[in-house]
Swiss-Prot record:
Keywords, ordered alphabetically: Heme, Hydrogen peroxide, Iron, Metal-binding, Oxidoreductase, Periplasm, Peroxidase, Signal
Lineage: Bacteria, Pseudomonadati, Pseudomonadota, Gammaproteobacteria, Vibrionales
Residues annotated as binding heme: 353
EC number: 1.11.1.6
BP terms from Gene Ontology: hydrogen peroxide catabolic process; response to hydrogen peroxide
Domain of life: Bacteria
SMART domains per the UniProt record, alphabetical: Catalase
Annotated protein name in UniProt: Catalase
Amino acid sequence: MHMSKSFLIISMGFVAVSVQAQTLTRDNGAPVGDNQNSITAGEHGSVLLQDVHLIQKLQRFARERIPERVVHARGTGAHGEFVASGDFSDLTLSAPFTSKGKITPVFVRFSTVIHSKGSPETLRDPRGFATKFYTEQGNWDLVGNNLPVFFIRDSIKFPDMVHSLKPSPVTNLQDPNRFFDFFSHEPGSTHMLTWVYTNLGTPASYRTMDGFGVHAYKWINQKGDVNYVKFHWKSLQGIESLRPDEVVKVQGQDFNHLTNDLYTQINAGNHPKWDLYVQVLTPEQLSKLDYNGLDATKVWLDVPEKKVGTMTLNKVPDNFFLETEQSAFAPSNLIPGIEPSEDRLLQGRLFAYADTQLYRLGANLFQLPINRPLVEVNSHNQEGASNSAQTASDINYQPSRKLELKEDPQFKAVQTQLVGSVQQKAISNPRNFYQAGVLYRSLNEQDKQDLITNLXGBLNKVTDKEIKATMVSHFYRADKDYGTRLARATNTDLKQVAKLAAM
């Protein structure tokens, strides 16, 4: 390789390629004369404030970081496409599902949930599975996880739950004493805890895990008919997770194993695929379930699934910060034909996720290329920091006789019949333990053993015997064999566990 002032000459066999080097500039476009030495007052004098290039470099360096996501901080993304497997316009007027073979561009961000940016990807955690569909009706975000349920059912407990799972404000260490103290007061968490302490809580690859929308949503068709749906991404690569002994081994070799695997496989042309399935219930069918079908701690048991399309991820981001880090997902990013259900956790997420993105990225986050819709945006939202919109009109209000910008009545929210009165109380028929037992009994013996090993490992770090016994009693109520084996693994008195379970 030979380098001159203006050119790089690269010889490869019989091929020579000349690349003219671009001139280094400051942010205002002015060329830089010396990027190696500061301007000083003489050879041994102080650095001068007039060295605007130096000052700008230091200023920009100090401002490179934006606020970390409060949850889902560690993540990786990929571009791809979703192809509809049929015409489902009888169920929804949402663009991705209205014609067979319809192609919709997507961007997916996988993530851990609790742990910070830069933390090992081997840590036990649910995994975020967020998909942004760029449709001709606007952007739709399906913001889910790799597990089908969640720890809580009401968003009023979300900050408390996250605080308990995050590091202690005293030691800055995650502490099972703290989060099991919280969960001992939340029996509805039993189902999700069972899921996350299986080996699914430590996936071997983002490619080899499923994804779930977790919540129920409403699908609305052109006639205004309403059905409730749940979404399920099924990995066509199969399901592969790390067993307890494998977690330690992998972490010692590569604590970025999920990101490395996804990037390596996509760049090698091994593009991962997921089929998207939906479960569909009419409002009447939903009301007849023997549990609350709008409870985020529940799955819809024995409700058939319908395949609606396939997603392929085929390109890694050109720049991590510009695309993956600045991508902003929120369940409130909906399009015609999809509306939120009355799920209490989802209702809170509609606000919280959109609000945290405004905090991270500012009011004009939708102008960032990764978040920008394919369709033209016509709104009177204006100004704010870092606004690059092209606005010349004098009319920034609606309605106006001077500007034809009007709403379209066909996209009004669907009418929902209400019953009862304003109230503040827990849901009826919570059935906190039943589905955790169903899950436990569905596991093979090896998976049961790994579940007990994983769960007991953290419970054995709990120093308060009452908290530990209460937690074991929750799992005992889900399934006696489950609780008995866990009591044995944690040296917890089984008689005390049975007594607590009977209360």
